[in-house]
Swiss-Prot record:
Glycans are attached at residues 69, 145, 270. Homotrimer; disulfide-linked. 2 Ca(2+) ions bound at each subunit interface in the trimer hold the trimer together. Interacts with the intermediate capsid protein VP6. Interacts with the outer capsid protein VP5*. This is Outer capsid glycoprotein VP7. Coiled coil: none annotated.
Amino acid sequence: MYGIEYTTFLIYLISIILFNYILKSITRMMDYIIYKFLLIVTIASIVVNAQNYGINLPITGSMDASYVNATKDKPFLTSTLCLYYPTEARTEINDNEWTSTLSQLFLTKGWPTGSVYFKEYDDIATFSVDPQLYCDYNIVLMRYNSSLELDMSELANLILNEWLCNPMDITLYYYQQTDEANKWIAMGQSCTIKVCPLNTQTLGIGCQTTNARTFEEVATAEKLVITDVVDGVNHKLDVTTATCTIRNCKKLGPRENVAVIQVGGADILNITSDPTTAPQTERMMRINWKKWWQVFYTIVDYVNQIVQAMSKMSGSLNSAAFYYRV
């Protein structure tokens, strides 16, 4: 009887040892499989971390810095308003207390002291290189200049819309624009853009891909360039990258917390790139006054109506994201 019990005990003991051995073997095998899988994934991610030649990747970057949305029933009492104006306005007014005067006038329209910020920029070209719109509501004043009409139109197109952008490696790859919302946006001290359209055999159409001097020049020494080419056609690009950054961008829609007020000019600038239509936006306005005091008085008078045409947003335009965000 004792022999049977010892035998049963030994069988149980051997079963436990065998089960433990099998379990450890399975564990080691699973560890090996998992580690090998992770190694393969790591190597593959390194290898495919670049765009294949001529293939278009989804545009995922952003020019927006996110902030908490604090929309209230009475936005004028809880929001901030930024007023962007050219240096010539301050020079003409020539009064050290002029912003304080305007702040008191904005107070009569329901905007508390400290909620309105006055932001100065040198000129349209300089503002185009580094546009940063941080307030809940942003009003940009542009003095109309017939020689700068196209620059003003491009700047308005940039700041009145939201864009998603990806970097472009023009030294290795060619690119194509997929639709009307897809544009190439370049910013910098001096941007000269040349393009060479390609056929299905990746040969240049009217140009030589190995000779940038044969490319078509679409922009010369500009600070902001929004380039539009034929959709669905691959292009080789040549850009002055030492003084310019170019991105592949997709227009998402209107940036509704920004309004542009054109000072002077017969008509409001048309910012559309579609030649078949001439759409106007409520947030593109015009004031006809010669003196800047008159301009600012009008802004104060109509500030609440202007803001009503806008919407408070949770994102603010930050051009630093254009340069550094992937």
